[in-house]
Design a protein with these regions (language model features):
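Conserved oxyanion/phosphate-binding beta-strand-loop segments in alpha/beta enzyme cores
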Residues: 7-31
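Long, structured ligand/cofactor-binding scaffold of large enzymes
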Residues: 29-130, 141-152
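Conserved glycine-rich FAD pyrophosphate-binding loop
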Residues: 33-43, 55-58, 65-66, 70-72, ...
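Short beta-strand-to-loop capping motifs
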Residues: 48, 232-238, 306-314, 378-385, ...
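Short, conserved charged micro-motifs
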Residues: 52-55, 119, 237-244, 312-320, ...
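FAD-binding subdomain of flavoenzyme oxidoreductases
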Residues: 98-102, 111-253, 511
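C-terminal cap/substrate-recognition region of VAO/PCMH-type FAD-linked oxidoreductases
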Residues: 201, 217-218, 228-239, 243-354
Length: 511
């Protein structure tokens, strides 16, 4: 490793090779459980170009040095910049932060991995371009990294990987490939048409360790002729069944235009308040306190945030259909921003997010009960009321049994619900971290037993989640391993990412 680090310094300069105390920022910000030896980087390197990435990869191959790639390292609740395999060198792409092109006519951007949502938003605003981003909740993350990890947002362009078009990838041998139309010299549709000619390979570079994405095209939304965000609140937890049954036909028929979310009481309240304001005790809040929070914050046990996009002639019709569909639920309330007088307010916050304005407001929930740690449990289900209430009962029951408040949302996709439960815990309390670990593993087992799979997870659980996708004697993982061995025979790229290990590290792996 010493010789490899010296070679890295010759490539990048000593200022961009980090060792010793300088590696501290590449640790998991929320270590789970209490084990200081896990997920520890030996060093980190920060290239500034594709050519420098190529050179680093070639040296890593020569010395068999494992590289853990991060775009900006802001994937908090999923491990941050920490590697699965301790002793890895973090390949930090945050210096590769060029916005190479933003095309207003065709609605796309071509960016490097270090470009954040704040960066791209600022670029568009400074130039007065009539384009909107789609952003996840924390805007400090990488546009490329979030798409590769199957992140989601809240406009009609909410499927971030679905909106990527054309990649540049450095393979494990240092070779550079461009996918789709980018494989043709002098082609001018690289960011316009995904597929090119032959197999579509972009997908194998998402949530994987088969290559290092150094450029990506991302589609941007043209600024609509009108925008109307709204909030619909529901007074009972059991309402989630009827709410989701109403949502499905509205979504399938594009009456609901965006990736709307159905958010729980505590998740929304926690953005702007703390638990101690209502219940200065340990354990989950009782029903009486939940009702107090509802009245104080003017929200429901479930809160549906959505938006309408387009000229009034269109949005008026869509709103009438939406309002009439939900009006059948007893106690339902409808709001537009002008109806919300208190500040700060959940609809005012979400109104920005649903028009692509990056923020960090969502991190407010970390102050709910102190300690600042959180992890996301994210099983996927069909858009049915039966599945929604089944998942809610299963997850919220276990969360409360373990002494935590249920903080969840159901994000409405094109055909599916992402049920994202945020478990907030005291990262400084070893017992609470252990309790969190036990809860998470129980949730994974019980969800898998019901056929619900997670779509992303913390590095601590990648092997565990990968193991739940075991149909036909784990034939999918066997295919992943075959691809891994072919593209990365020395196993240097992000060992253990998504449970995919190189041949020499596979034996004896357990979740």
């Amino acid at each position: 490793m010493v010789d490899a680090l010296e070679r890295f310094r010759k490539i990048l300069g000593a200022d961009w090779v980090f060792t010793g105390d300088k590696v501290a920022s590449y640790r998991d910000p929320y270590t789970i459980p209490n084990d200081a030896e896990r997920f520890q980087a030996r060093a980190a390197v920060a290239p500034a170009s594709t050519e420098e990435v190529q050179a680093i990869v070639k040296v890593a191959n020569e010395y068999r040095v494992p590289l853990w790639t991060v775009s900006r390292g802001k994937n908090f609740a999923y491990g941050g910049a920490a590697p699965v395999l301790s002793g890895s060198v973090v390949l930090d792409l945050s210096r590769m932060n060029r916005i190479l092109e933003v095309n207003e006519k065709f609605g796309y951007a071509l960016v490097e991995p270090g470009v954040s949502y704040f960066d791209l938003y600022r670029y568009i605003q400074e130039r007065g371009l009539k384009l909107w981003l789609d952003v996840p909740d924390p805007g400090w993350g990488s546009v490329v990294g979030n798409a590769l990890d199957h992140g989601v947002g809240y406009t009609p362009y909410g499927d971030h990987f679905g909106m990527q078009c054309g990649m540049e990838v450095v393979l494990a041998n240092g070779e550079v490939v461009r996918t789709g139309m980018g494989a043709m010299p002098n082609n001018n549709t690289w960011q316009l048409f995904k597929y090119g000619f032959g197999p579509y390979v972009d997908g194998i570079f998402s949530q994987s360790n088969f290559g290092i994405v150094t450029k990506m095209g991302i589609w941007l939304m043209s600024e609509p002729a009108g925008y109307r965000p709204y909030l619909i609140t529901f007074p009972r937890e059991e309402d989630i069944e009827q709410v989701v049954e109403i949502v499905r036909p509205l979504r399938l028929n594009n009456v609901l235009q965006n990736a709307a979310t159905i958010r729980s009481l505590v998740l929304d309240a926690a953005l702007f308040t703390t638990k101690s304001q209502f219940y200065p005790h340990a354990g989950p809040i009782p029903d009486s306190v939940a009702k107090q929070i509802m009245a104080d914050q003017e929200i429901g046990m479930w809160n549906f945030c959505g938006a309408l996009y387009g000229p009034p002639a269109i949005t008026d019709v869509l709103w009438t259909a939406t309002r009439d569909a939900f009006a059948s639920i007893p106690g339902v309330k409808f709001y537009f921003p002008e109806d919300r007088k208190r500040r700060p307010d959940i609809l005012i916050h979400r109104a920005d997010t649903m028009k692509g304005i990056p923020k960090l407001t969502e991190f407010g929930f970390l102050n709910w009960n102190g300690g600042g740690g959180h992890v996301g449990f994210s099983p996927v289900s069909p858009i049915t009321g039966q599945d929604a209430i089944k998942q809610w009962r299963m997850v919220s029951g276990r969360v409360r049994e373990h002494g935590f408040d249920y903080m969840g949302l159901m994000a409405v996709g094109f055909r599916e619900l992402h049920h994202v439960t945020v478990i907030v815990y005291d990262q400084n309390d070893p017992q609470e971290r252990q309790k969190l670990d036990e809860l998470f593993r129980l949730l994974v087992r019980e969800a898998a037993a019901e056929g619900y799979g997670e779509y992303r997870t913390h590095i601590n659980y990648m092997d565990t989640i990968a193991g739940t996708y075991g149909w036909n004697d784990s034939s999918l993982m066997k295919m992943h391993e075959t691809i891994k061995d072919a593209l990365d025979p020395n196993g240097i790229l992000s060992p253990g990412k998504s449970g995919i290990w190189p041949r020499h590290l596979r034996a004896g792996r357990k979740s």
